[in-house]
């Protein structure tokens, strides 16, 4: 069968394997690429290619991540797999690998383990919207009742963290047997591919979301007015549309009277483009870096939120010492730093470099935010942590 050329016409979906150490996440990743490439075209990735994950930097944090891709008849998948537990924590919190869905791998021989729970909780906190379960190593369990018991346990655990545990797909398989070419177990990988296709909805593209442009710079052009520049985060801005300026100060409304890119005038600016937006009747000192330009009513400013946070270790260039109650670092959202006071959870006295935890923050100025927004924690310009807004509290 001839290899198909890469079709950009297929919808693109981001997924990843999550779950306890040694439950077979990387073996499953290899099995998916091997079986699906044999069935639908594409290229297989061997276990050691995936396991030897390259390091990458996200928000100043080094993370080891393997990226593979594969196709089903209707979709193209980009899939991330991390070698170590700490890499998962960092990956999920920084959003280095934004997942439209997660494949939770649970060994039938062990059932749910501490990291199984931790990854489900993290998935809930950082906003992984859909989870599919692959029960691995089922070839090593002869007792049908035991398999049912493990499946029930996993479903209950997912319910506990507000995933629809009773309804989501659970596939019982063996990644190793599938990788070795055993036809009975290969079928289970095909089944997993079908579950990805049917259970994870097509993600909304950045361009279809409401317009947001984080402001990086402000200029005044004599005779024309004020121009703000930045990279359009999502959506489209058209000349003549009303926009809101949100964050830091009170929200104000204005109209976009021009869009330019590389000194050329355009009718619109789109997600991913670096543009200048001319604002009608807005004075130079009424806008500043750190605010966002947004579709009216689509995003609101907040000061109080709960966050899931990873604190950099000393080796990663983070703090050398723990921090305590009353910690007041800067929180870097999109384009600017805002000081905030940290409220540690009950019973937590201090936080060590390398920890991950949930805490509350009160900023000294409001920032345009929604749940799922990523930020860095900084001290005097140096990154000491990364976080994601898991819940807005005001």
Swiss-Prot record:
Q: Where is this region: G1?
A: 19-26
Q: Where is this region: G4?
A: 136-139
* Signal peptide positions on this chain: none
Give the InterPro entries listed for this entry: EF-Tu_GTP-bd, EF-Tu_GTPase, EFTu-like_2, EFTU_2, G_TR_CS, P-loop_NTPase, Small_GTP-bd, T_Tr_GTP-bd_dom
> Which GO terms label this protein's molecular function in UniProt?
GTP binding; GTPase activity; guanosine tetraphosphate binding; translation elongation factor activity
User: Binding residues for GTP, per the UniProt record?
Assistant: 19-26, 81-85, 136-139
Query: Which parts of this chain are annotated as the region G2?
Result: 60-64
Q: Where is this region: G3?
A: 81-84
Q: Which PANTHER family match?
A: ELONGATION FACTOR TU, MITOCHONDRIAL, ELONGATION FACTOR TU-RELATED
| Family to which this protein belongs | Belongs to the TRAFAC class translation factor GTPase superfamily. Classic translation factor GTPase family. EF-Tu/EF-1A subfamily.
Q: What does this protein do?
A: GTP hydrolase that promotes the GTP-dependent binding of aminoacyl-tRNA to the A-site of ribosomes during protein biosynthesis.
Protein name (database record): Elongation factor Tu
- The organism encoding this protein is Alteromonas mediterranea (strain DSM 17117 / CIP 110805 / LMG 28347 / Deep ecotype)
Task: Report which gene this protein is encoded by.
Answer: tuf
């Amino acid at each position: 069968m001839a290899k198909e050329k890469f079709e950009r016409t297929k919808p693109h979906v981001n997924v990843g394997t999550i779950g306890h150490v040694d439950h077979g996440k990387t073996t499953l990743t290899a099995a998916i690429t091997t079986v699906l490439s044999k069935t639908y075209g594409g290229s297989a990735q061997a276990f050691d290619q995936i396991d030897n994950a390259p390091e990458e930097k996200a928000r100043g944090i080094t993370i080891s991540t393997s990226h593979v891709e594969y196709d089903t008849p209707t979709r193209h998948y980009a899939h991330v797999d991390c070698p170590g537990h700490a890499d998962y924590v960092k990956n999920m919190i920084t959003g280095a690998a934004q997942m439209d869905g997660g494949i939770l791998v649970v060994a039938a021989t062990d059932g749910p383990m501490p990291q199984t729970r931790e990854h489900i909780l993290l998935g809930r906190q950082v906003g992984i919207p859909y989870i599919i379960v692959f029960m691995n190593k089922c070839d090593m369990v002869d007792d049908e009742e035991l398999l049912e018991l493990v499946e029930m346990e996993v479903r209950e655990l997912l319910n506990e963290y507000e995933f629809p545990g009773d309804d989501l797909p659970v596939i019982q398989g063996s990644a190793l047997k599938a990788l070795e070419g055993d036809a009975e177990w290969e079928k289970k990988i095909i089944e997993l591919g079908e579950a990805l296709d049917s259970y994870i909805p097509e993600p909304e593209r950045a361009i279809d979301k409401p317009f947001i442009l984080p402001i990086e710079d402000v200029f005044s052009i004599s005779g024309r007015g004020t121009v703000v520049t930045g990279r359009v985060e999502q959506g489209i801005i058209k000349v003549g549309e009303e926009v809101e300026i949100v964050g830091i100060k009170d929200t104000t409304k204005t109209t976009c009277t021009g869009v330019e890119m590389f000194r050329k005038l355009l009718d619109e600016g789109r997600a991913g483009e670096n543009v200048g937006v001319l604002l009608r009747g807005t004075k130079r000192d009424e806008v500043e870096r750190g605010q966002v330009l947004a579709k009216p009513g689509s995003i609101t400013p907040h000061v109080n939120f709960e966050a899931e946070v990873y604190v950099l270790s000393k080796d990663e260039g983070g703090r050398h010492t723990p921090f305590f109650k009353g910690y007041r670092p800067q929180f870097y959202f999109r384009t600017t730093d805002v000081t905030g006071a940290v409220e540690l959870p009950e019973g937590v006295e201090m936080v060590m470099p390398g920890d991950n935890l949930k805490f509350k923050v009160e900023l000294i100025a409001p920032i345009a935010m929604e749940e799922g927004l990523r930020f860095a924690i900084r001290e005097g310009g140096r990154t000491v942590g990364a976080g994601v807004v898991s819940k807005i509290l005001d």
